[in-house]
Amino acid sequence: MQPNDITFFQRFQDDILAGRKTITIRDESESHFKVGDILRVGRFEDEGYFCTIEVVGTSTVTLETLTEKHARQENMTLEELKHVIAGIYPDQTQFYVIDFKCL
């Protein structure tokens, strides 16, 4: 079985497959992805593969510079997005936005 290149919490799977979630915000450990990369996507909880994505953009962001656009791309409110990011990456300030599309 081929390993996944990136994982998402299972709760995001349906939004990704439906095209409602088109970005992911990660810490420095996942800042190496670049435009044009084709990635196998799995669930964080069980590593189960569920789709393939293409990276279509990358940028940097902080909690303070997150916008309503980022929130829409994550299919959340801005308040929800800030809460989720702070919960996943406590004590971090610099993040990496990966824009993607399902293939």
UniProtKB/Swiss-Prot annotation:
One of its GO terms (cellular component) is cytosol. Its EC number is 3.5.1.135. One of its GO terms (molecular function) is hydrolase activity, acting on carbon-nitrogen (but not peptide) bonds, in linear amidines. The keyword Hydrolase applies. It comes from the Bacteria. CDD domains: ASCH_yqfb_like (cd06552). Keywords: Hydrolase. Residues 6-94 form the ASCH domain. It is an enzyme of class 3 (hydrolase). The active site is at 21 (proton acceptor), 24 (nucleophile), 74 (proton donor). The keyword Hydrolase applies. It catalyses: N(4)-acetylcytidine + H2O = cytidine + acetate + H(+); N(4)-acetyl-2'-deoxycytidine + H2O = 2'-deoxycytidine + acetate + H(+); N(4)-acetylcytosine + H2O = cytosine + acetate + H(+). HAMAP family: ac4C_amidohydr (MF_00684). Belongs to the N(4)-acetylcytidine amidohydrolase family. Catalyzes the hydrolysis of N(4)-acetylcytidine (ac4C). This is N(4)-acetylcytidine amidohydrolase. It comes from Citrobacter koseri (strain ATCC BAA-895 / CDC 4225-83 / SGSC4696).
